Amino acid sequence: MEEMMQFLRTRRTYRRFEQRPVDHAIAAEILEAARIASCGANRQTLKYVLVESPAMVAKMQPLVHWAAYLPPEQGCPAPDETPVLFIAVCQDESLPGANDTDAGLALGSMTAAAWAHGVGS
């Protein structure tokens, strides 16, 4: 239990990233962590899109507003500090039982798996 608590105490959220590629096998394991996350009634209403192509990542970057949470004095991440991949979590709201809680659980599992692989999220 102590190892788990230490893991949870040391995991951090990043808004500036090193420009090191993430191995596809690691990205696939992060996706698997989301896939096996708990969800209401096992409805599986979430879908995932892995974006690894540098060209597509560059197109997505301006659409992501997470850096807006930074205080103005910290500014937005520079071009050499942006993510090298994205995993989009999509909720199929046409399915019964779709809810934000399931997305939160999947995201929590993904961030834990990423951290376990030494990948900031």
Predicted regions and their residues:
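Short helix-capping and hinge/turn segments at secondary-structure transitions, especially at repeat
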Residues: 62-65, 69, 92, 116-119
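Small-aliphatic-rich amphipathic alpha-helix that forms the alpha element of a beta-alpha
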Residues: 30, 34, 87, 93-121
